[in-house]
């Protein structure tokens, strides 16, 4: 019987949706969206991050004033309880993804280990 990896991937997706880590992100993001100030800070910071990523991908340097603005945004975000909660939840989920990735690549690691 052939193994359908996509079936397992879909099961993993559902398990992630059912996980406490996913629910924590969902709840934390709802708090950010429901608070006007938190949402504004979050959106501005995401815009800045995306802009930086685009510039880096295009090989452009990021101007000092943009870096200073990003620093100010980061400091404001650290003080926002809702965003801090979201970031902590994201870190926990990131750890889960790293651990799952290690499990997924284990068969390949074993092949190349010899």
From Swiss-Prot:
Q: Where are the transmembrane segments?
A: none
Q: Which InterPro entries match?
A: Com_YlbF (IPR010368), YheA/YmcA-like_dom_sf (IPR023378)
Family of the protein in this entry: Belongs to the UPF0342 family.
NCBIfam families listed in its UniProt record = PRK13676.1-5
What is the protein's given name? UPF0342 protein SH1117
The organism is: Staphylococcus haemolyticus (strain JCSC1435)
